[in-house]
Amino acid sequence: MKDIIIASFYKFIPLNDFESLREPILTKMHEIGIKGTIILAHEGVNGGFAGNREQMYIFYDYLRSDSRFADLHFKETYDNKNPFDKAKVKLRKEIVTMGVQKVDPSYNAGTYLSPEEWHQFIQDPNVILLDTRNDYEYELGTFKNAINPDIENFREFPDYVQRNLIDKKDKKIAMFCTGGIRCEKTTAYMKELGFQHVYQLHDGILNYLESIPEGESLWEGKCFVFDDRVAVDQKLDRVYPQLPQDYKYEREQK
């Protein structure tokens, strides 16, 4: 049995006091023994952390004790080893950095599709299936027939849209990422530009892999994750792909 719970979460919500939240959260992580990284910004919170079951449930309750976080949803995976080496709480301009001002996923994100709905939807040949992740993530694994935007970081995605999709505002566009947060921003951004039919995989690739049997899955390869596991297979088990020595990535994205 895998004893370590690895949780990822995010919420877009205005946090005018986000700077003052850093020290209390970090202190609680140290007190409980939780390891991982939490990002705070004016637009909300994003993070991934791990511990044993008792530690995690205590920390869940602590975070939810703030009324603004009472409905936080923690997406869990499991391992025999904690994939984080320390506790960190960072202050940023954005909880996932796209670099576009006035994009508000809290009210204008794309339509959510459950894994089962997504599985059927992306088999429609009229749907544009777009991987919003970085090129190194795409190379490890992606959905069958997904388009690679060929970007090195998330900040390049808006430029990709402007160069390649701006004339497709009437098309059905389905977007996905690891845990859902990047799709919240990309779909909101595209709706602001006037795209009419924008969809996203609810809770991301990890939710799909957990929900759809491997024999039926349209996922091909491994799924990159933003911790020391590096990637997981279709059973959400840790794998160790051979990566370039200069391999770099941004752990805060999901």
From Swiss-Prot:
Coiled-coil residue windows: none
Enzyme Commission code(s) on record: 1.14.-.-
SUPFAM superfamilies named in the record = Rhodanese/Cell cycle control phosphatase
| InterPro entries in alphabetical order | Rhodanese-like_dom (IPR001763), Rhodanese-like_dom_sf (IPR036873), TrhO (IPR020936), TRHO_N (IPR040503)
Ranges of residues in domain Rhodanese: 123-217
In its UniProt record, a GO molecular function of this protein is:
oxidoreductase activity, acting on paired donors, with incorporation or reduction of molecular oxygen
Which Pfam families does the record cross-reference, listed alphabetically? Rhodanese (PF00581), UPF0176_N (PF17773)
Known catalysed reaction(s)? uridine(34) in tRNA + AH2 + O2 = 5-hydroxyuridine(34) in tRNA + A + H2O
Keywords, sorted A to Z: Oxidoreductase, tRNA processing
PANTHER family from the UniProt entry: RHODANESE-LIKE DOMAIN-CONTAINING PROTEIN 7-RELATED, THIOSULFATE SULFURTRANSFERASE/RHODANESE-LIKE DOMAIN-CONTAINING PROTEIN 2
Report the function annotation for this chain: Catalyzes oxygen-dependent 5-hydroxyuridine (ho5U) modification at position 34 in tRNAs.
Q: What is this protein called?
A: tRNA uridine(34) hydroxylase
- Source species: Legionella pneumophila (strain Lens)
